Every structure is written in C-alpha cells, then in structure tokens.
Amino acid sequence: MTLEQNYTAILGQLGEDVSREGLLDTPKRAAKAMQYLCRGYAQTLEEVTNGALFSSDASEMVMVKDIELYSLCEHHLLPFIGKAHVAYIPNGKVLGLSKVARIVDMYARRLQIQENLSRQIAEAIQQVTGAQGVAVVIEAKHMCMMMRGVEKQNSAMITSVMLGEFRENAATRSEFLSLIK
C-alpha cells in the first residue's frame, strides 16, 4: 500500500467522503508533504556537509544561533517548531557556516523527540569537526501539547547537550549560555 493510499484510508476512517471536491487530491498532497517533512532519512552527514571542513587556527567558540527548525513528534506525528543554538570550539578545523544549519535540518526532518534531536546534532558536529567541545540548545513549541492533551499554548520545551569543553568547563558553558539569551 502506498503512502497516498494510506492517507485515503485514514480520511475514510475519519468519516470523510474522499470523493468530495476538496479532498480529491489531498491524499497525494499529504503523501508528498510527509515525504518532504521526513526527507532527513534520505540524507547523510557526508552529503549535507559536502566537504566544507576547513583548516583553521581558530580556537575560540564558533556559534550559530537562532537556527529555525521544524520537526515531527514521533509519538503523534504533529509538528514541533523552534530554534537551535549550536556552538563548537574548533580543534584545527572549522565547518562551513551553512553546514551547521543543514545538519540541524537533516536531523529535524525525521520523526523525532526533541531530546534525541539535540543529541544527534551535537554528536554530528563533534564527529565532523573533531571539536574540543560542542553545545546545542533547542527551544521549541510542540503542537502535540498545544492542540491536544493538556492544550497549553504558551509552554516551550528547552533541551541542551554539552560535550567536551562545554560539559567540563563551567566558564565555557556559561559563556555559551549567556550568548544565546
């Protein structure tokens, strides 16, 4: 059964008339949208970084903040939307600026929980750069909590992962946290 056929079945199970004008192409559009929203499964770290790793004497923190992200909760298939702040301390290599955002997108475009997403991003940056430390903080609003269940509209979830120098050195961690405020 194709994804499109599954969406047709779901609409029918919900009591919808799948032959009505407004729904005629909905299963096809929904299948295409889901494939787009989950395109991270078809990407690899090597593809998204595309060799954009450069020798550098930089030894201070490199940060990209306010990276918009959109993902789908693996429990309800509902979106969570937020921003990621990613920093690393180079160890002879720096990553092309856009590649940090591409790494965030690759992992966000999979069925996820935010806790795992934060860890996956941090570990990927560490793996690619060999950095002395990596820090990731994600703040997101979860539609599964806003539209159903407790229906809390103004709550946000914050997760953080600190590796290497960011975990071991309180001053480095504090500097990062002060910069993302």
Curated annotation (Swiss-Prot):
> Sorted alphabetically, which SUPFAM superfamilies does this protein's record hold?
Tetrahydrobiopterin biosynthesis enzymes-like (SSF55620)
EC supergroup of this enzyme: hydrolase
- InterPro entries, per database record: GTP-CH-I_C/QueF (IPR043133), GTP-CH-I_N (IPR043134), GTP_CycHdrlase_I (IPR001474), GTP_CycHdrlase_I_CS (IPR018234), GTP_CycHdrlase_I_dom (IPR020602)
Protein's UniProt keywords contain NAD: no
Instruction: Choose any GO biological process term that the UniProt entry carries and state it.
Output: tetrahydrofolate biosynthetic process
| Catalysed reaction, written as an equation | GTP + H2O = 7,8-dihydroneopterin 3'-triphosphate + formate + H(+)
**Keyword Transport belongs to the record:** no
Q: In which pathway does it act?
A: Cofactor biosynthesis; 7,8-dihydroneopterin triphosphate biosynthesis; 7,8-dihydroneopterin triphosphate from GTP: step 1/1
The record's keywords, sorted A to Z, are: GTP-binding, Hydrolase, Nucleotide-binding, One-carbon metabolism
Give the EC number. 3.5.4.16
- Single GO molecular-function term? GTP cyclohydrolase I activity
Its GO CC terms are: cytoplasm
Give a Pfam family name: GTP_cyclohydroI
**Family note:** Belongs to the GTP cyclohydrolase I family.
Binding partners and assembly? Homomer.
Protein name, per record: GTP cyclohydrolase 1 2
Specify the species: Pseudomonas syringae pv. tomato (strain ATCC BAA-871 / DC3000)
